[in-house]
């Protein structure tokens, strides 16, 4: 009888698990819209910060973090299936000890890129980047920076993701005199047309040394396919707050970088900074630069609404920009990542001129959810071709994808 009762409770729990449904447009007046299909769960036992990119052989690869490790899996059918048998573990947690104690170095916010088939040094190499974060060995306390600094690290594969190199640390913040959650964050990997490999990341290090909580976006570069890396140079800093969470695209002769930023009195909000490929951030893009701009018809800058964690891609005909938005209350204390939904806007590529675009529109939400009890956060996008996209989301602690099609409204 007890067994039957427990079996009934198990079935009830499974049947009552919240399942996401497809979202829709928030902007009925726009001339373009995204038609979303039903969300599909990919990782069955948790997972976060998912990213999907197409490989040179046509497959899709997804990176994500889970249980303090960095994982990847693959799809051979445009994202319809992601077999468990395809899972690999490019980057693993480890422990570190010194006179200050013991720390678990967990892998967070992984990203990757496959180098082009005509790369001058390592054609087809996959560079998997992760952010090692020091925490207590039980995982409950973050910021054990007296033991080990926050670190940007890579692992590489030269056989299309079958096997992976040992992990290498390529940028380390400082080991501080006290335990603080201060360091470097959120790597993003990009290859320039000449084969230069770039890793962008957010960095608090130089400011914390001076007693400030500012943060910049920096970049390090490799001219030999990932063997050696330059010292960081600052890409952007707004002069009064924090730039964070960089994601970068190439369009025509320019580099466009989506970031979240803030100023005194504002919540985090998304913007874009740009530079020519030739200029390549020789000087930082600062607050008043014409190449730091609001890409939306209606700016998301607010002292109440939170809209951070941006992502940007291009399709055949469009620029697509996503962010997570918490707008459920007039009280800003309710509007944070615990109550955020994924939102997406688009504009034609042809709207980009002179290093700027400001016509993003047709806001829509790939997953329809109750923001008081559900979240869709740390999202990303992937171009599938023919103006079809994947929205990729950490929905309630699980990895989901949603297929969408961008169409002109009749």
What kind of feature is each model-predicted range?
Residues 1-8:
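Sec-dependent signal peptide recognition
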Residues 8-9, 293:
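Intrinsically disordered, low-complexity regions
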Residues 14-15:
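C-terminal motif of bacterial Sec signal peptides marking the signal peptidase cleavage site
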Residues 19-23:
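Ser/Thr/Gly/Pro-rich low-complexity, disordered linker/stalk segments of secreted
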Residues 24-410:
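Asp-box/BNR beta-propeller blade signature and adjacent active/binding-site loops
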């Amino acid at each position: 009888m007890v067994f039957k009762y427990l079996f009934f409770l198990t079935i009830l729990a499974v049947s009552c698990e919240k399942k996401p449904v497809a979202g829709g447009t928030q902007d009925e007046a726009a001339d373009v819209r995204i038609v979303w299909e039903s969300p599909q769960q990919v990782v069955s036992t948790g997972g976060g910060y998912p990213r999907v990119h197409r490989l040179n052989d046509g497959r899709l690869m997804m990176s994500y973090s889970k249980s303090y490790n960095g994982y990847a899996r693959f799809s051979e059918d445009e994202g319809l299936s992601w077999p468990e048998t395809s899972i690999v573990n490019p980057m693993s947690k480890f422990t570190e000890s010194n006179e200050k104690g013991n720390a678990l170095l967990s892998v967070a916010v992984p990203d990757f890129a496959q180098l082009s088939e005509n790369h001058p040094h390592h054609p087809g190499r996959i560079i998997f980047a992760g952010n090692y974060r020091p925490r207590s060995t039980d995982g409950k306390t973050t910021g054990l920076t007296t033991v080990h600094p926050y670190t940007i690290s890579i692992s590489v594969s030269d056989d299309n993701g079958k096997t992976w190199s040992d992990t290498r640390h390529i940028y380390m913040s400082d080991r501080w005199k006290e335990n603080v959650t201060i360091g470097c964050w959120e790597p993003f990997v990009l290859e320039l047309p000449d084969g230069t490999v770039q890793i962008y990341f957010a960095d608090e290090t130089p400011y914390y040394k001076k007693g400030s909580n500012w943060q910049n976006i920096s970049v390090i570069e490799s001219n030999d396919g990932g063997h050696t890396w330059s010292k960081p140079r600052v890409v952007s800093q707004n002069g009064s707050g924090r730039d964070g969470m960089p994601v970068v695209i190439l369009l025509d002769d320019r580099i466009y970088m989506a970031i979240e930023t803030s100023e005194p009195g504002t919540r985090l909000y998304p913007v874009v900074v740009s530079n020519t490929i030739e200029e390549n951030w020789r000087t930082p893009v600062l607050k008043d630069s014409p190449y730091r701009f609001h890409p939306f018809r209606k700016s998301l800058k607010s002292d109440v609404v939170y809209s951070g964690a941006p992502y940007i891609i291009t399709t055949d005909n469009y620029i697509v920009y996503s962010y997570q938005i918490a707008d459920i209350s007039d009280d800003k204390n309710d509007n944070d990542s615990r109550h955020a939904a994924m939102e997406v806007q688009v504009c034609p590529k042809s709207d980009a001129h002179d290093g700027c675009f400001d016509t993003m529109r047709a806001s829509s939400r790939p997953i329809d959810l109750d923001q008081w009890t559900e979240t869709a956060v740390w999202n990303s996008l992937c171009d599938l071709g023919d103006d079809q996209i994947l929205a990729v989301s950490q929905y309630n602690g699980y990895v989901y994808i949603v297929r969408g099609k961008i169409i002109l409204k009749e």
